[in-house]
Amino acid sequence: MAHPAQLGLQNATSPIMEELIAFHDHALMIIFLISSLVLYIISLMLTTKLTHTSTMNAQEIEMVWTILPAIILIMIALPSLRILYMTDEFNKPYLTLKAIGHQWYWSYEYSDYVDLAFDYYITPTYFLEPGEFRLLEVDNRTTLPMEADIRMLISSQDVLHSWAVPSLGVKTDAIPGRLNQAMLASMRPGLFYGQCSEICGSNHSFMPIVLEFIYFQDFEVWASYLYIVSL
């Protein structure tokens, strides 16, 4: 969950997000070192009065400033490619959840269970309970089991949307007529918030996403109860 005046990323609850945070810190340190070196060279050039007028070429320096950037790019590219392949790894999922974007709400279908489908609308401000978040609460929370691989199938019925939950490191476009998939897993129980991250019309800001991860046994009881009620 984001907080006022927060400088860093949200706390990770999935292995992918932990890898993304580590890569962010890795890239930021490289940028900091490069910026420090550039500022140091600029300060030297502005403060020194010494010049080397007889130098026509410098093969050693040219070799250094050609090889060094290549090494830096490799140091950034290798962990980035590793995370990219991790996001495309789909082990045998325990559960498949389909999210469909509409103007301006989300609908979910539990594809592994019969007739489990819900529409989720934003909770109006005057219905909020103490401690709930404005523009982030919905009338029905999406319930999922923790410590389980969950495959998300994401699409749209009208215009472009984007299904994004920062704490899980997930952001997948919802495109009409196309199914995109993403894998997510939470290592701890709790509520995790997201929003539509693609401009989709006048009420784009009113498409929150709320995932409630619970223990596996509780999820089985919850799913069984809903199945019995739907009969």
From Swiss-Prot:
Its EC number is 7.1.1.9. It is an enzyme of class 7 (translocase). Cu cation A2 binds at residues 196, 198, 200, 204. Its main location: mitochondrion. It catalyses: 4 Fe(II)-[cytochrome c] + O2 + 8 H(+)(in) = 4 Fe(III)-[cytochrome c] + 2 H2O + 4 H(+)(out). Its cofactor is Cu cation. GO terms for biological process: ATP synthesis coupled electron transport. GO terms for cellular component: mitochondrial inner membrane; respiratory chain complex IV. One of its GO terms (molecular function) is copper ion binding. Component of the cytochrome c oxidase (complex IV, CIV), a multisubunit enzyme composed of 14 subunits. The complex is composed of a catalytic core of 3 subunits MT-CO1, MT-CO2 and MT-CO3, encoded in the mitochondrial DNA, and 11 supernumerary subunits COX4I, COX5A, COX5B, COX6A, COX6B, COX6C, COX7A, COX7B, COX7C, COX8 and NDUFA4, which are encoded in the nuclear genome. This is Cytochrome c oxidase subunit 2. It comes from Lagothrix lagotricha.
